[in-house]
């Protein structure tokens, strides 16, 4: 049974983390992921308005602590940009985000690696390395988790070898890791019907020691589509059984496992409670020795 299982959770005015905590409790989560502000903006309210202390008091009643908190960095920064001004902006935004993570007690910050705009993939990867080393040097504790990407357009991070290239060049290895998104992994061409192959890919191209967070998502598209279109659990092309067996792996089941499946204003957060219940029900009957 996954120890840290939850979903994307809303974080917004007026109650911020208090409302996030209430939503997490309502869906019976043991983990949660939030953006500390609008996902497509670097704007953040002062930390003292985010109500983390009160939120943690609520979470404590359900034995949830900061080990289950994951923060997602804003989408607007491209840490792989060749533009010096955009690099400096990325450093500034990411540094501020990690400082907020430190105050919030968040161990992991998920980051999209960026795009190779008007440059080669290797040049973009080198720019990402440069930015990350500077940010890590300015900050402490929180681990930056590079998210695996589906391969749309100029995205970097569509292959674990690219992310390992970056990790190998980060000075402080304790501050860098990977967030594996199952929809992105599938859409990039990894076939979850061959779990032995999936685990071998992780072992040979990355190493399980760098796997820190799982985004548990279904996909609306075929393997290798490079589309990045999430589907709800048990309603996609990867297969519920394949996803469950994937997260049952001994080196995965204890990581924060976060659902980012589709929700609307009409079914949030109830849809996540239903999916978490489905996952736990599967684990209650799973017999690994029989498979």
Curated annotation (Swiss-Prot):
PROSITE patterns cross-referenced by the UniProt entry: AP_NUCLEASE_F2_1, AP_NUCLEASE_F2_2, AP_NUCLEASE_F2_3, AP_NUCLEASE_F2_4
Keyword vocabulary terms for this entry: DNA damage, DNA repair, Endonuclease, Hydrolase, Metal-binding, Nuclease, Zinc
GO MF, any single term: phosphoric diester hydrolase activity
Co-factor note (free text): Binds 3 Zn(2+) ions.
GN (gene name): nfo
GO biological process: base-excision repair
HAMAP family: Nfo
UniProt-recorded name of the protein: Probable endonuclease 4
Reactions that this protein is recorded to catalyse: Endonucleolytic cleavage to 5'-phosphooligonucleotide end-products
E.C. no: 3.1.21.2
